[in-house]
Amino acid sequence: MTLSEKIVDYVISLNKKEIPEMVYLKAQEHFQDTVACIMAGAGKEAIRLAVDYCVETTGSNASSVIGYKDVKLNSGNAAMVNAMAAHICDYDDMSMELNGHSSTVLVPTVLAVGEEMQCSGTEILDAYITGIQINSVLGRLVANTKIDPGWNLTSLVGIFGATIAAGILYKPVSYTHLRAHE
């Protein structure tokens, strides 16, 4: 069994009802903090340029860009722009297990896909928590790996948690999601 298959099996086996209430409360807190970071970064010139580029090249779609009332992009571009805005002021959360910024990658992803798929708030939060779990597990696995300057675990590991979280919201979670990161 490949590592990707093991990760998907782990995700499928998770029972959200076993997640302690404190985890949900902390997840809501980190989620709200990340949305605040996105709002703080939304007006920065680099974000405006990214929004303009995405609108010009892909047009309107189903997912909102926070801070831009009338702008909707495809879920991938909305997640990208919102993630850029979340990190641009560098106030985003820090995961000690990942040694990176999980929420910066996950919140924009689950918001964009959740809006596209018309998911409930609970479904979005569950996908976010699962993404955090995946990033934390993978972060611990590579914790002692030497990372070259210019790279960090947010970009190297965060894609896996974000892919899993998006896959959960696109439903159903299965081995078909394995190809999403390839």
Map each language-model feature to its residues:
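Conserved small/polar residues in nucleotide/adenosyl-binding loops
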Residues: 176-182
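Acidic, glycine-rich active-site loops and adjacent beta-strand->loop/helix elements
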Residues: 113, 128-138
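Secretory-pathway/luminal and periplasmic proteins that interact with or process carbohydrate-rich
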Residues: 59-62, 134-142
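Alpha-helical support elements that line or immediately flank enzyme active sites
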Residues: 34-41, 102-122, 160-171
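Terminal-appendage/accessory-domain detector
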Residues: 1-99
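Glycine/charged-rich beta-loop-alpha catalytic/anionic-binding loops adjacent to active sites
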Residues: 86-95, 138-149
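Active-site nucleophile and cofactor-binding loops and adjacent substrate-binding regions
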Residues: 98-103, 125-128, 146-159
